[in-house]
Amino acid sequence: MSDPRERIPPGNSGEETIGEAFDWLDRTVEEINRAAVNHLPRELIFQVWRRSWEYWHDEMGMSVSYTKYRYLCLIQKAMFMHCKKGCRCLGGEHGAGGWRPGPPPPPPPGLA
């Protein structure tokens, strides 16, 4: 008889699909963007998004999902550092920040 402590927890059966992982990644990117806009300048978020695509996707030839994952890691790190330094935002938006000349970069998911 097997030990009941050895059972696989619900939701971790290995039956999840790659499609579900991609859906999770898309949802998570949108959610962190909605949260990040309350703590980080929009220009920073947009530039990290744009540079992630330029570097990881265009220059390095990585997949769309890998590019989104790398962007997610960078924004999570930025949010962590912001909160670690003592967030005093209280839910207020920072606004656009210092926009560079020319049209703004395309917004990341969740900020369109």
UniProtKB/Swiss-Prot annotation:
List residues traversing the bilayer.
none
GO CC term, one of those recorded: virion component
Its localization reads:
Virion; Host nucleus
> Keywords for this entry?
Host nucleus, Host-virus interaction, Inhibition of host innate immune response by virus, Metal-binding, Viral immunoevasion, Virion, Zinc
- Say which domain of life the source belongs to: Viruses
Family statement drawn from the similarity comment of this UniProt entry: Belongs to the lentivirus VPX protein family.
Q: Which InterPro entries match?
A: Lentiviral_Vpx_assoc_factor (IPR053711), RetroV_VpR/X (IPR000012)
Task: Kindly list the biological process annotations in GO that this record carries.
Answer: symbiont-mediated suppression of host innate immune response; viral life cycle
- Report the residue ranges where the short sequence motif Nuclear localization signal is annotated in this entry: 65-72
Q: Name one Pfam family in it.
A: VPR
GO terms of molecular function: metal ion binding
Function field: Plays a role in nuclear translocation of the viral pre-integration complex (PIC), thus is required for the virus to infect non-dividing cells. Targets specific host proteins for degradation by the 26S proteasome. Acts by associating with the cellular CUL4A-DDB1 E3 ligase complex through direct interaction with host VPRPB/DCAF-1. This change in the E3 ligase substrate specificity results in the degradation of host SAMHD1. In turn, SAMHD1 depletion allows viral replication in host myeloid cells by preventing SAMHD1-mediated hydrolysis of intracellular dNTPs necessary for reverse transcription.
Residues that bind Zn(2+)? 39, 82, 87, 89
UniProt subunit comment: Interacts with the P6 region of unprocessed GAG. Interacts with host VPRBP/DCAF1, leading to change substrate specificity of the CUL4A-DDB1 E3 ligase complex.
Task: Return the protein name.
Answer: Protein Vpx
Q: What is the lineage of its organism?
A: Viruses, Riboviria, Pararnavirae, Artverviricota, Revtraviricetes
